[in-house]
Amino acid sequence: MADLQQLEDQIVSLSLLDAAALVKKLEERLGVSAAAAAPVVVAGGAAGAGAAEAAAEQTEFTVILKDAGANKINTIKAVREVTALGLKEAKDLVDGAPKPLKENISKEDAEAIKKKFDGVATIEIK
């Protein structure tokens, strides 16, 4: 039990970059993904109309970087602010656009991110 507490304390004390590296290593070693699974809506018979209304009221959004724009440096800076990625990871994300920046976030957070990239890069919210 004390070993678990020590492990928890060590994990909590990691920097964000170290924690991200730990997650990647665990994903590779265990063959899993830390990304949240997308919710699945199954509609059947009379419940179909209710399910369609629920789908129309989306609560989780994905912010996608569609195009880095003319000034990649400013885009990389904005990506780092929004995602807390390191410089190399942010550059790779910008160079590989279109790619998701943030997934499963609220509409307010998605709009705030879109405002941050206004005039810097092309952002799409899904």
UniProtKB/Swiss-Prot annotation:
**Is Ribonucleoprotein a UniProt keyword of this protein?**
yes
Kindly indicate whether the keyword Ribosomal protein belongs to this entry.
yes
Q: Which Pfam families match?
A: Ribosomal_L12, Ribosomal_L12_N
Give an example GO molecular function.
mRNA binding
Keywords, alphabetical: Ribonucleoprotein, Ribosomal protein
Family statement = Belongs to the bacterial ribosomal protein bL12 family.
- What task does this protein carry out? Forms part of the ribosomal stalk which helps the ribosome interact with GTP-bound translation factors. Is thus essential for accurate translation.
The protein's name in its UniProt record: Large ribosomal subunit protein bL12
- What is the species of this protein? Acidobacterium capsulatum (strain ATCC 51196 / DSM 11244 / BCRC 80197 / JCM 7670 / NBRC 15755 / NCIMB 13165 / 161)
